[in-house]
Amino acid sequence: MNLDYLDFEQPIAELQAKIDELRRVGTSQEINLTEEVNKLEEKNAQLTRQIFSNLTAQQIVQLARHPLRPYTLDYIQRIFTDFNELHGDRHYSQASAIIGGLARLNGEPVMVIGHQKGRTTQEKIYRNFGMARPEGFRKALRLMKLAERFSIPVITLIDTPGAYPGIGAEERNQSEAIARNLFEMAQLKIPIICTIIGEGCSGGALAIGVGDRTLMLQYAYYSVISPEGCASILWKSAEKAGEAAEALGLTANRLYELGLIDEIIKEPLGGAHRDTDAMAEKLKKHLQANLTNLQAKSANDLLEERYRRWLSYGKD
């Protein structure tokens, strides 16, 4: 099994292996196999479109968790310039599961904040698997307040399996840190654009998710709980995660239908990890368009629209 491909993608992986083998044979034996390779590549593209046209909610969750999926730093490096990371919550510690700092988007100053996961074992431990402790949320709020002081817009990138549930986090008042962020973000007199780029799970996502616009990548998910957590509670078995994912309505299409997100950003064929540069360029265009629109509004209009927007959730 090719680990770069998920279980439902294995037919694609097998065809890609044949393409790679043909290329190797053509190169090593100096045979022109271009026509055969092109035919197989077209067949592979058709197969990929067929599989991805009918994904289940659980398969989308798998894509959101793909180990090669772009993380916050991948987008920062491609979308923004002059990024200057800011550290610490000024209360307890640095909190590496959330990163943030000043940057420029097409020359305009912005404050970028997002969850960061790791790729290697050491990075995953350092980033706490993208699960923020209270100091992470407090750091994020400190940076947002700093941005407000200088009238700089805030852009958040959400990608977390949830807030860290450890004893230490609870002792340092995890729930208060999340609630404080919700309260304060609702009142910031600057534009806030939130984008779910991967996992958007529970309070850990919402703690940097209160804004004027909520964007979502096509194969990300946004939910009050993970499918496995929901299945363990309702069915006493994580094996029911597929049913839970469907019931939670956590996909971008379903959330857009419910009016809980504003835009769905299409991903490259096969997911964002298949072409990170193209995905970043598309995200950049959406961020710039929304930022231009929001910057034309007064602070009072931003607050009024934000208030009405969040008050309307769940009414229909």
Curated annotation (Swiss-Prot):
InterPro entries: Acetyl_CoA_COase_a_su (IPR001095), ClpP/crotonase-like_dom_sf (IPR029045), COA_CT_C (IPR011763). It is an enzyme of class 2 (transferase). It catalyses: N(6)-carboxybiotinyl-L-lysyl-[protein] + acetyl-CoA = N(6)-biotinyl-L-lysyl-[protein] + malonyl-CoA. Gene3D superfamilies: 2-enoyl-CoA Hydratase, Chain A, domain 1 (3.90.226.10). It is found in: Cytoplasm. Its main location: cytoplasm. Pathway: Lipid metabolism; malonyl-CoA biosynthesis; malonyl-CoA from acetyl-CoA: step 1/1. Its EC number is 2.1.3.15. It comes from the Bacteria. It holds the Pfam family ACCA. Residues 39-293 form the CoA carboxyltransferase C-terminal domain. Keywords: ATP-binding, Cytoplasm, Fatty acid biosynthesis, Fatty acid metabolism, Lipid biosynthesis, Lipid metabolism, Nucleotide-binding, Transferase. Component of the acetyl coenzyme A carboxylase (ACC) complex. First, biotin carboxylase catalyzes the carboxylation of biotin on its carrier protein (BCCP) and then the CO(2) group is transferred by the carboxyltransferase to acetyl-CoA to form malonyl-CoA. Acetyl-CoA carboxylase is a heterohexamer composed of biotin carboxyl carrier protein (AccB), biotin carboxylase (AccC) and two subunits each of ACCase subunit alpha (AccA) and ACCase subunit beta (AccD). Belongs to the AccA family. This is Acetyl-coenzyme A carboxylase carboxyl transferase subunit alpha.
